[in-house]
């Protein structure tokens, strides 16, 4: 189900709680909402649809991916980026890394581990910042 975009900065600034099996419906809603906004958005976190859970969805080079409880476990090659957000107006500068190794759970709650680079890595870092309550 496509949900309304949350623009409440106080809510967005809260650190997300771990996602559980009961949150799989939220994961699907997040993906549905991202697809509905794909012309102007490449990634979303659950707090952007008003749910304070550690779930992200993003465009992974044309194939959409949902991550539950994502954690960056390694990062390299820092750089400065300028990013916008569907939940906030304007753009902001952020420190990012060209390569990140992420551990997460898929929709079957299986643990996954993968290295992402470039634009996809930047998207993931932005969405994980949302999970941490960091406004970008």
Question: How would you label these PLM feature ranges?
Answer:
Residues 1-136:
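Positively charged
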